[in-house]
């Protein structure tokens, strides 16, 4: 039986993307994304929070998009897989790093956060569903020939989605 190696992260960038170019000319972007959990301690009633930092690497076109549009504080949705790579430090010692290799990058938040991304997206010829989120999938992984989708120009006046208002009132207590 084949295993599953899938990671889904929703969080905020801790720094601007670190951009590099590989010897073959392909772009590489490294980002650091914070995810937080908060809860109320049942014994003390004290509010607790734990933040985890995740190293994520994107290659090729996704790296270019990340470098162009993401900034410190940007909220992102990332799908990818865990990868461990081996490298040598300055002393020649073998080191290992486990990171997420990003396959899907979706910018969350509002248009004010990342600029006029949807307009740039349409001018570049990418297929952009009309929504408040901008999807930067690599390849055609979400293509379904039997499904029809309507595409439209970006809207300038967008209202806050109902799902966000539900989450604003969400009780963070752990149910067990």
Swiss-Prot record:
Checking Gene3D superfamilies in the record gives: Nucleic acid-binding proteins
Record-annotated SSB domain positions: 4-109
Q: Where is the composition biased (Polar residues)?
A: 126-159
Short motif Important for interaction with partner proteins, span:
171-176
Highest taxon, organism lineage: Bacteria
Q: Which InterPro entries match?
A: NA-bd_OB-fold, Primosome_PriB/ssb, ssDNA-bd
Q: Which residues form a coiled coil?
A: none
Query: Does DNA repair show up as a keyword for this record?
Result: yes
**What's in the keyword line of the UniProt record?**
DNA damage, DNA recombination, DNA repair, DNA replication, DNA-binding
Q: Which residues form the signal peptide?
A: none
One MF term in GO for this entry? single-stranded DNA binding
GO process terms (BP): DNA recombination; DNA repair; DNA replication
Disordered, as annotated region: 126-176
Q: Which GO terms describe its cellular component?
A: nucleoid
Subunit annotation: Homotetramer.
General function of this protein: Plays an important role in DNA replication, recombination and repair. Binds to ssDNA and to an array of partner proteins to recruit them to their sites of action during DNA metabolism.
The name this protein goes by in its record: Single-stranded DNA-binding protein
| Biological classification of the source | Bacteria, Pseudomonadati, Pseudomonadota, Gammaproteobacteria, Pasteurellales
What gene makes this protein?
A: ssb
